[in-house]
Amino acid sequence: MKKILLLIISVFLIVGCSSQPQENKKVSFHQYLRQIFVEDMENDYLTMHSSLIHPEKYDIEVKKISFGNIDDKNINYKKRLKTLESYKDSLSGSDKTYYKILHRTYEDQVKMDDDKYEYMDNICDPNNSFTENMATSLLEFRFDNENDIKNYIKLIESGIDYCKQAVAYLKKQSEEGYFMSSRVSSEYLQSLNKLMTSSWLVSSFNKRTFSFSLSDEKKEKYGEDVKKAYEKSLYPGFKLVKEAVLKYKNTSKNASGLSELKNGKSYFEARVQSILGVDDSLSQMKEKAIALAKQSSDYIQSHLNAELYYKITASNSTGLRTYRSVIQDLLQRYQEDFEKLDHINYEISAMDQSNASSSTLAYYVNPTLDGKETNIIRVNENSTQSKDSLDAYSTLAHESIPGHMYQFNYARMLKRPEILYTVSYLGYAEGYATYVQDYAYKYAPHIDSDVKDILLAEQHLQYALVILSMIGIHNDSYSKTDVKRLWSDYQMNLSFTEVSSLYNQMLDSPFMMCPYYLGYMYIKDIQKNMKSKLGDKYTNKAFNKALVANGNVPIALLESTVIDSMEK
């Protein structure tokens, strides 16, 4: 399924050239890369708009204002691979790296476009549904001038066409036996119902402030137009989707994980591999998770005693009682282990509560690549996490410094060919941001180091057990009893209620934690290998610089790019 708006990392960049790749006339490698970037931007209005303030400067023509295509099959990746391969023998240096990254990216796309996997993606996943993505795209839409308001209204008006595509997809999904379970359908409908009123959209627009001149009368008129567009298009579209889900909700054959479906095991493995950008089998991934589980469990068992347990259960406050003070603290400390970036302008703003989950503390909104606007961290004032907690500190490290905000700003200064900024391996992006949370545990003030070490080991153990449970459910047909036994084997005794909640979450969203926890494990393995390879010459700062030195890359290539960077 197409991700309408990537809020996490690296889907953006700038370019100029002609609007279609000139396949019949051989151009230079860099010209070709610029051409396919333009093609991608012209085929994806939302990515183009969120990436560029002035697309016209790069000869990018807006073809259609819309949410795109549900199946995201408007690009011939096999043709791209063939054209890319025609340049292979002439490349050297950095161009070889660029070639490898793009070649792997398009190979993974071709693999997932296999007809046998068609209609297996759950576009109504309660944790990442297409309707929630539509809402997020509208709530985060950027207004640089009055024409953007007009385009915003056109985008809303296009919503019904996108929803009709979704309805056709759901119908076919039901016919193929891949429709979500009735329980997941009910969860999805709860979130959809929240969007079936214009208030969230209209109130969000009315709260906007604009950097350009707009009279109160005009803003009020545009607010009325937004409401009319919602009532004319978006609401009827959502209604069609709701009717389709109600119609097909009892046709599901997916009550016990993907392993029970035709091609389910193959799809699960292929999808995990494509999220990470690796060729490793699920068995090899399980080995990584088992190793981390054993290491973490052994540490906990050998270090936890009554005195330390008491300290852990006591109040563990960082003393930082605002989100701003947390980020300021991180900005002062991260330079111990990460290369300093020039001053990063950022602002903290509240999430729109119409689209916020109480379990979500914060997220990072990527700025454009041809502008100098402020980085934005959205925070949830109604989060269940206390602002002065270690969890809040590590989450903000994940989203800001030295996590996604650092990632994005470092990548932007690399000046690579533009198309490389459309590469988005979540296994790398989220694996890196999860990896830097280890440093957050190190940096967090006012909490004893032995407490932080135990709590971090518990986090690592949970990473491993979640991955083992995920693979167990969707590849090995684990029951709830199997999952409970797995956790008990590592002295994590969950109640049946806790097991049911965990099991259902992984059943509903098979890939949700994969990029975070498996990505983390791969990065830690690369770090271990580099420590062994370099010995006394190894430093965390050099390794962390090497991790971001090539931007977003498939993990299969990450170790070689890290080696190249650290051995220069």
What are these regions (language model features)?
Residues M1-I4:
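Positively charged n-region of N-terminal signal peptides that target proteins for export
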Residues V15-G16:
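C-terminal motif of bacterial Sec signal peptides marking the signal peptidase cleavage site
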